[in-house]
Regions:
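Walker A (P-loop) phosphate-binding loop of P-loop NTPases
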Residues: 7
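NTP-dependent small-molecule kinase module
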Residues: 16-18, 133-196
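ATP-dependent small-molecule kinase phosphotransfer cores
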Residues: 24-117
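Hydrophobic anchor at the beta1->P-loop junction of P-loop NTPases
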Residues: 2
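Hydrophobic positions on the alpha1 helix immediately C-terminal to the Walker A/P-loop
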Residues: 13
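Hydrophobic/aromatic beta-strand patches that form the interior of the parallel beta-sheet core
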Residues: 31, 86, 124-126, 171-173
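Conserved lysine of the Walker
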Residues: 10
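A glycine- and Lys/Arg-enriched "phosphate-lid" helix/loop adjacent to the NTP-binding pocket
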Residues: 89, 94-159
Length: 196
């Protein structure tokens, strides 16, 4: 599970990690949230590119609906056949974005997502850590609704990821360096799980 704020390199690192796993003969299913299913793509479009304002609770519910479909359609079947699932976002995103960033509360958002995930939890959470200022400079051109949020929101999300990582034993990887260096740092964390 790769996590982090906007423009921390999650998609890039998920692709690199999945490729490294495949190179070692491990079936790796690369996926993402929101939008990793047909229903999810529709919810993602509404959530990130819709014109109507979205209430924070409605946002959390939309993401939980996407997650429930994602778990049922992609994650659970992949795990059932023994594949590794490399996901760009999962429940930790909701805890940071909706629980802290939107002020809904981590415990409340976690409870909502317990229903959506039906007991599926990641074996490993890697948070790609980049300051919001550096991350913002990485986002070219047109931004989606979350990328357009103010600096205070992005700082709250960034700090939430750091706090949650420390409290829950998630791995924090400095993602401010080059893509290859970050990929090596991510692989170093994953290698510990692979080691017998």
């Amino acid at each position: 599970m790769l996590e982090g704020g906007e423009a921390t390199g999650k998609s890039t690192q998920a692709a690199r990690l999945a490729a490294r796993l495949r190179d070692r003969g491990i079936e790796a299913v690369e996926t993402f949230e929101p939008g990793g299913t047909s229903l999810g793509a529709q919810l993602r479009a509404l959530l990130l590119h819709g014109d109507a304002p979205v209430d924070p609770t409605a946002e959390a519910l939309m993401i939980a609906a996407d997650r429930a479909q994602h778990v049922a359609e992609v994650v659970r079947p992949s795990l059932a056949r023994g594949a590794w699932v490399v996901s760009d976002r999962f429940v930790p995103s909701s805890l940071a974005y909706q629980g802290v960033g939107r002020g809904l509360g981590v415990a409340e958002v976690e409870q909502l997502n317990a229903l959506a995930t039906a007991g599926v939890e990641p074996d490993l959470v890697i948070v790609l850590d980049v300051s919001p200022a550096v991350a913002s400079a990485r986002v070219p051109g047109v931004r989606d609704r979350l990328e357009e949020e103010d600096d205070a929101f992005h700082l709250a999300v960034h700090e939430a990821y750091r706090d949650l990582a420390q409290a829950r034993g998630w791995s924090l990887v400095d993602a401010s360096s080059g893509v290859a260096d970050v990929a090596d740092a991510v692989w170093s964390v994953v290698s510990e799980v692979l080691a017998p």
